Amino acid sequence: MSWFTPEVIDILISIVKAVVILLVVVTCGAFMSFGERRLLGLFQNRYGPNRVGWGGSLQLVADMIKMFFKEDWVPKFSDRVIFTLAPMIAFTSLLLAFAIVPVSPTWAVSDLNIGILFFLMMAGLAVYAVLFAGWSSNNKYSLLGAMRASAQTLSYEVFIGLSLMGVVAQADSFNMQAIVESQAHMWNVIPQFFGFITFAIAGVAVCHRHPFDQPEAEQELADGYHIEYSGMKFGLFFVGEYIGIVTVSALIVTLFFGGWQGPFLPPFVWFALKTAFFMMMFILIRAALPRPRYDQVMSFGWKVCLPLTLLNLLATAAVILYNAQ
């Protein structure tokens, strides 16, 4: 057992931590689909899914079995390779974006010094999945939906990046652990309130969630860029959307609400409670807000979110220069 050195033990522990965290994220994303339907039923004064298992508790299992046994159909004139790769890229990129989020002082998949840049890179990679899905399906409605979805996502990713620059400037680091530790005395949501508002709005848009779900809404363009997908390929898109919600909620907590910091309770409990709160806010937004037109969504981004992020960045720079004197 000469190879069983302390360095090997550290590597094995890191692998176990990474697997546990990512499995929890996937499980949370899957269970959120059931929780969303139950909460929407509560908000709309109806029952929601309550037939499979006690109180509908096995509805998720039934959905997984149904999706697993559905025909994995591929359009005759599609590009089969790209058609198959698209849902894999969508699922993997959104899952890997969570890798830089610290769940506690000692638990994170990867403690990168360029953590925020890694998240932006993974968010950008998800756009390729949308374009691949729309183009490879050889369907005009799918392609139009993909073009609209990618234009919306790329636009709002600009606002996400700019809204994060104020946080980076205050913490003087791209490292997520350093950003959490910089909030020991005051959460970033107070000095970076406009950055938080913009990041939250852009996060909803990047996840293609209501009210920014025009590219894939049932009433718009025949269900959008994944119209030709079925079976587990569609399931990867479906679960990937909810994993995106978990990731954006965790990033809001980490960047603006002190991450795992809090009194009395263990750090990971604080992180889980804060993240669950913002996941519920995603559901509440879907239940409460109407869906605007696509041109209104794009105009709102460039005419409201962009000036707000630039104003926030300018104010942050002025405060930092004033404190440095």
Curated annotation (Swiss-Prot):
Indicate whether Cell inner membrane appears among the record's keywords. Answer: yes
Keyword Translocase among record annotations: yes
Which processes are annotated in GO (biological process)?
A: aerobic respiration
Q: Mind telling me which NCBIfam families this protein's record contains?
A: PRK06076.1-1, PRK06076.1-2
Protein name as catalogued: NADH-quinone oxidoreductase subunit H
Family statement: Belongs to the complex I subunit 1 family.
> Where is this chain's protein located in or outside the cell?
Cell inner membrane
> What are the EC numbers?
7.1.1.-
Catalysed reaction, written as an equation: a quinone + NADH + 5 H(+)(in) = a quinol + NAD(+) + 4 H(+)(out)
Lineage: superkingdom: Bacteria
Q: Which Pfam families match?
A: NADHdh
Alphabetically sorted, this entry's keywords are:
Cell inner membrane, Cell membrane, Membrane, NAD, Quinone, Translocase, Transmembrane, Transmembrane helix, Ubiquinone
- Per its UniProt record, what PANTHER family does this chain match? NADH DEHYDROGENASE SUBUNIT 1, NADH-UBIQUINONE OXIDOREDUCTASE CHAIN 1
Tell me what topology the record assigns in the membrane. Multi-pass membrane protein
InterPro entries to which the protein is assigned, alphabetical: NADH_UbQ_OxRdtase_su1/FPO, NADH_UbQ_OxRdtase_su1_CS
Q: What role does it play?
A: NDH-1 shuttles electrons from NADH, via FMN and iron-sulfur (Fe-S) centers, to quinones in the respiratory chain. The immediate electron acceptor for the enzyme in this species is believed to be ubiquinone. Couples the redox reaction to proton translocation (for every two electrons transferred, four hydrogen ions are translocated across the cytoplasmic membrane), and thus conserves the redox energy in a proton gradient. This subunit may bind ubiquinone.
Checking HAMAP family in the record gives: NDH1_NuoH
The principal localisation class reads: membrane
What are the recorded GO MF terms, alphabetically? NADH dehydrogenase activity; oxidoreductase activity, acting on NAD(P)H, quinone or similar compound as acceptor; quinone binding
Q: Where are the transmembrane segments?
A: 11-31, 81-101, 114-134, 149-169, 186-206, 237-257, 265-285, 304-324
What is known about its subunit structure? Answer: NDH-1 is composed of 13 different subunits. Subunits NuoA, H, J, K, L, M, N constitute the membrane sector of the complex.
Q: What organism does this protein naturally occur in? A: Serratia proteamaculans (strain 568)
